[in-house]
Amino acid sequence: MWQLLLFNVTNGLIIGAFYVLMALGLSLILNLSNVINFAHGGFLVIGGYIAYTITPYIGFWGALLLAPPLTAIIGLLVERVLIRPLYGRDPLYSLLLTFGLAFMIEDGTRFIWGPQGKPVTIPAFLAQPLSNDLFFITGYRLFMVAVVMVAVTLLFLLLRYTRLGIRIRAGTLDLETVAALGINVQMLRSLNFAVGIFLAGLSGVLAAGQLGLEPTMGTGLLMPSFIAIIVGGIGSLPGTLVGGLLIGVASGLTAVFLPAASEAVIYVMMAVVLLLRPRGLFGEEGMMS
């Protein structure tokens, strides 16, 4: 029993780590640009397939370093051509656009790489379990959690101590004032969008190494990532971090005692949080609250 419990809690933490990376990218874009990016899961898929394509040439480590920035560059192009013209308009326009874009990415990856699942080869030593008793905890699972921790730490350092991060935080509070100070708001939005898509691409590489690839894999991570933002509090990146981990662990624990409700529990959690705290657990004005 204890092994089953430990397995599901560990699995929940790992899934929660994916939710955190995805949700932080979504939250960055939403907070500054007021864009609900339904194509975020599609960019995760793009990152994974880029890693799959280049791994035979530069290895897994090279793909891990190269695929996320390449995904961010693709995101920049999409933002410049499709999303930027919709800034300042009703958010429904960008929501519908990214919703359609998600289907375009899914069909595009299916056309280029085929509908069959694709494996991404990871280093052999990462595929080994830690011990016979903890056979379900492989080195790669711990590696994924470590990468997420490093990425989240670097993101918060960027937002707290760099000029770009300070401008992003200021723009979240009052974009008009930032523009009045002579800061290029369009460039700020673009760079912020690229950071968010970078996180999606990184999530895709990590997920591909664990789960393999298929064109629809981003869809399964997208809605829980939105729920993580809502539970943690819209506008709060620390809240998004906590929300992602909470729903991951809750899903894992529920799988032990009530397997049929393991997916539904995150929606129940969202409903309870909204009833008790409509702004979420940490929701306040401003993204670093």
What residue ranges belong to the model's regions?
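Cytosolic-side transmembrane-helix boundaries in multi-pass membrane proteins
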Residues: 81, 112, 172-180, 184-187, ...
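Inter-helical junctions in multi-pass inner-membrane proteins, predominant
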Residues: 2-18, 158-163, 189-231, 251-264
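Short loop segments and helix-boundary regions at transmembrane helix junctions
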Residues: 31-39, 73-116, 158-165, 170, ...
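Membrane-interfacial amphipathic/re-entrant helices at transmembrane-helix boundaries
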Residues: 1-21, 50, 60-62, 89-94, ...
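Membrane-embedded helix boundary and interhelical linker motif in transport proteins
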Residues: 32-77, 81
